[in-house]
Amino acid sequence: MKRAICLGTALVFSLFSTTSSVCAASPGLFNVRDYGAKGDGKTKDTAALQKTLDACAAAGGGIVCVPEGVYLTGSLVVGANTTVRFDPHANLMGSPDIGDYPLVGVRWEGEFRQGHRALISAEGADNVRLEGPGAIFGPPLALSRLRDPRGPLLIELTECTNAVLEGFSTQYQQLWSIHLLFCRNFTASNLTLRSLNANGDGIDVDSCSDVTIERCDINTGDDAIALKSGRGLAAARLGRPTQNVTIRQCILASSTFAALAVGTELSGGIRNVKIEDCTLSGRQNAIFLKSRDGRGGFIENLTGANLVINKSPTFIGIDFLKKGIQASDPVPGEAEKWTRMSHVSFNHIRVSDVAEIVAGSNVSAERPVDGLALTDITGTCERGITLANASDVKLTGIKVTGFQGPLVTTQNVKGQGLDGTAVR
């Protein structure tokens, strides 16, 4: 614990050179020190921090300032119209005691169940802001390994409108760093997120609308950004898609899976997603579009532009069959059980140290992909494009070198540029 605090504090010092306090007295400002917080890294400050947040909420909102120090804390709940502002040298450190994270209802892996409340949470609270600079450290590994009930996440916002996360860093989180559920008009900007191990997602966007993620540096043990909308019949009936998502000017990396994952929890659907002006690298895929038999839902209107893809076995992975594994909670109906994918396009992409441009053979013939366009793809790769069961495919200006075998390999695919000659 002490070593993690020292490492994290040193990182924050290097990232933010300013030493000016964010806690100068002003109307509507609530200093956690005034409510008894010690910030010594030893005393549990949970009660004092929550008391400050409650006082701010009772006043109708304001600014809760966290001055320099290391604040050891359990779960905290932020109210409406509250801005939590961290000093550049303020560190929030998750408690190692599971009793400091009460059991609540959560959606985890697409299903509603019991889980431990996140280190920082807000529910049904509009106009919540968390502002850096400053750093938030997740609970220890032992808590993050909890699966049933789910261990504590770092930040979880549920049914929140107009939430903003800006300018802070997170460290050593073993589960999802940020989970957004049923949120609208959300912005994440200038965040630096780091996590370890599988399940250490960066930002999970779950049945949310109008989301912007910009100028973030996310390097995780699992998916850097994951787009979800629940799974099974309950999520399909609920019908709350993730939609209108913009990801721009970000650096996204995953040491285990994908820089950007779409699915497999997508029974509510995912649509209108833009990713632009980003650099991506993934241990398995830079971008992974995934589902399985029985999951249902849809992926539609997903576009990518001006992307740099580095050190990834695959630029785009498409897998809707999951090695034949059927969903344990299938959406009923032969037509409805297959995920629909339509109107997906990528333009002006630079690939480097990428094994394969597209791995897209795991698609059901019962629900072919409808509309996939790749334009202006340059760089080097070992293999080209593999597609199965797709229509209205357009390949234009794919000027890659270094590959072996055919540039384009297809099975039951209709479209333009499929012979591998017109595209170069």
Regions found by a protein language model. Give the residues of each.
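Bacterial N-terminal signal peptides
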Residues: 8-18
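Short amphipathic alpha-helical "recognition" segments used for binding
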Residues: 6-7, 54
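Positively charged n-region of N-terminal signal peptides that target proteins for export
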Residues: 1-4
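Extracellular/periplasmic carbohydrate-active domains that bind, remodel
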Residues: 14, 23-424
